[in-house]
Amino acid sequence: MALFRLSAAIVVIFLYIWSPSQRIQCRCRSFERCWPSQQDWSALNNSISGHLVNPRPVAYVCHDPDFDHDACEHVRYMANNSLWRASMPGALQNTVWESSLVSTQTCLPFSAREQPCNQGRIPLYAAVVESKKEVQTAVRFARKYNLRLVIRNTGHDGAGSSSGPESFQIFTHRLNSILYHSNFCPGGSHSKYQTCAGPAVSIGAGVMFRDLYARGAERGFVVTGGDSGTVGAAGGFIQGGGVPAFMGYTWGLAVDNVLEFEVVVATGQLVIANADENADLFWALRGGGGGSFGIVVRVTMRTYPDLPTLKGELTVSGNRHDPSFWTEDIAGLLNALRAFNHLDAPGVFRLIQTSAKGSISAVLEVYLLNRTLAEDLTRMMGPILGTSRRKYNISPITVGKISSFANPNEPTITEFFGSTILSRNFFESPNGPLVMAKRMAAINLDPGDGLLTSNLGGRINNENSDLPLHPAWRSSAHLVSLVVNVDTSLRARERAMVRLTDELMPMLYAIDSSQWVSYSNMGNPNEPDFKERYWGMRNYRRLVSIKKKWDPKDLFIARVGVRSDGWDSEGMCRT
């Protein structure tokens, strides 16, 4: 009898240890007993006005047993439409993150019909929320059942944080309110602080820059936003720091211009965060990374006049194996960029390798704000380019408003990213542009790979606001981003990730060897030293402290985000 009782006790202990509902080290998964029942999911659906869906990869209609010819043709036609993808819970803008990271599970629109369609990293359920209350309800549900929670607006994401296997998605795309304030007072007009900040705009979590710029154009305002029209204005872009392509030089980073957040935190509570109220959370959200501290349902930013703007383009083509192409043509464009900056004209440099034989195409875009005469920019170009202007194709000057230069609907991508920040001391050194060009030449690009810059410096260097971003941002000149084209197969993705981390990133950081600093929104998704690269250890420790306060159980975890090192790469199990 004693032996029986001992054996029974061992069985009970074994079942306790291995019972999925007791494995607090992992999120609950669909094959475990802790997973919500159909009745639980139905109750959630009823509580959020019927807005719960079961996302499937958008290409499932192109594969057996669900093949539908007409539906598949529509998916194939829309596959590269960024606006369409933004509206689909089962799609991402960067399709590399739709497929499994550890298996061949894919579901691609142009693969063979008989090839199985697998869920991959597309969430199993999505709450397509239409109100703040629905966000709160969905967060509480995820917390109650210990679900892997992912947050998605438009699906622009360089590290895969908007999707995840066995996950529950909160899809914020329909929270698209835009409210202009002639004089915004954080905390409301009856706030005890009574510190009003002038013109501003409050935007819902689902607002895209294309819509915000369009509304601003009607009223004559613009914000320091991105140049990609389908990027969400209130999500990961701004919470990661918010680097505009060229407006930052004049008005600072997007986070320099945030006045207030409205956030659903891990308890499901809706809180206001600004410089006076929940100031620690306000600090963390202005650069601490998206998907780490809560779900921002509304953000309020300063606005600026939608000024008339001139845009000029200089292009050049050559071969990467020709040293003079780098030391003369590319260095010449970078020298011109520096000279334009000295005249308060920001610019963007882009370079792409177009063939396996090493063909390179490069362009410098220059912006001159608050000017309406094309001749103003033409006269500026003359002394800057001098006799070297013969090397470049100079496009006609474009005259427009700032808001008109955003890309309204860029194509879908399959890419990995990396980035580095160049210091002002490096770029302004006598041979800075030449050294930059030579070190770019050393980066072994493949066809479809590219390099691009975003203009920092200017107002970004002059801001005194305290941010979580690495301190090097305040003495920066340019952000250089690396774009690596990736094939869809698992083996190709694995090779591309290794190549990016082990080969390309060290060469990218070596452009300015005085500092190794990166931008999380365009960072290596496998960055081994992300804490130091993105924030610096002092800021990172402060971010960790704030996260422990607001999200002690890590309901919100983003790949290479705050406290993500305590979890596996999918945020599913603690390590």
UniProtKB/Swiss-Prot annotation:
InterPro entries: BBE, FAD-bd_PCMH, FAD-bd_PCMH-like_sf, FAD-bd_PCMH_sub2, FAD-linked_Oxidoreductase, Oxid_FAD_bind_N. Glycans are attached at N45, N80, N370. The modification Pros-8alpha-FAD histidine is found at H156. Keywords: FAD, Flavoprotein, Glycoprotein, Oxidoreductase, Signal. GO terms for molecular function: FAD binding; oxidoreductase activity. It is an enzyme of class 1 (oxidoreductase). Residues 118-306 form the FAD-binding PCMH-type domain. PROSITE patterns: FAD_PCMH (PS51387). The keyword Phosphoprotein does not apply. It catalyses: peniprequinolone + A = yaequinolone E + AH2. Its cofactor is FAD. Belongs to the oxygen-dependent FAD-linked oxidoreductase family. FAD-linked oxidoreductase; part of the gene cluster that mediates the biosynthesis of the aspoquinolone mycotoxins. Within the pathway, asqF performs FAD-dependent dehydrogenation of the dimethylallyl quinolone peniprequinolone to yield the conjugated aryl diene yaequinolone E. The first step of the pathway is catalyzed by the nonribosomal peptide synthetase asqK that condenses anthranilic acid and O-methyl-L-tyrosine to produce 4'-methoxycyclopeptin. 4'-methoxycyclopeptin is then converted to 4'-methoxydehydrocyclopeptin by the ketoglutarate-dependent dioxygenase asqJ. PANTHER family: BINDING OXIDOREDUCTASE, PUTATIVE (AFU_ORTHOLOGUE AFUA_1G17690)-RELATED, FAD-BINDING PCMH-TYPE DOMAIN-CONTAINING PROTEIN. This is FAD-linked oxidoreductase asqF. It comes from Emericella nidulans (strain FGSC A4 / ATCC 38163 / CBS 112.46 / NRRL 194 / M139) (Aspergillus nidulans). The lineage of its organism: Eukaryota, Fungi, Dikarya, Ascomycota, Pezizomycotina.
